[in-house]
C-alpha cells in the first residue's frame, strides 16, 4: 500500500524540486485550488487527485517514506 502524502510532505517536495503550486497543479492535472487547499490543510484531495499529485512529484524523483521524503541529488 502506498504511503499517504501529507500537506507538509507536498510542500517539502515542491521546495526540494523548486516547483510552484501552479506547476504542480498543471503536472498533476488538478486545479490550483486543490494544491493550495491541501497544502494549507483545508481539505484532502479525492483519491484520483491525490494519486495524480503524488505521481507528478514521484515522476520528478521524489520518494515518499514513512519518515518523510527523499529526492534527487543536485547535479
List each language-model region with its residue ranges.
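A detector for short, charged/polar N-terminal pre-domain segments
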Residues: 1-5
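Short alpha-helical DNA-recognition segment
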Residues: 18-36
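Short basic helix-loop element that most often maps to the first helix and adjoining turn
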Residues: 8-23, 52
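DNA major-groove recognition helix of helix-turn-helix/homeodomain DNA-binding modules
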Residues: 48-65
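A charge-rich, low-complexity, intrinsically flexible signal that marks solvent-exposed coils, linkers
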Residues: 12, 43-45, 66
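Helix-turn-helix/homeodomain-like alpha-helical modules used for DNA recognition
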Residues: 62-75
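The DNA-recognition helices of helix-turn-helix-type DNA-binding domains
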Residues: 31, 42, 60
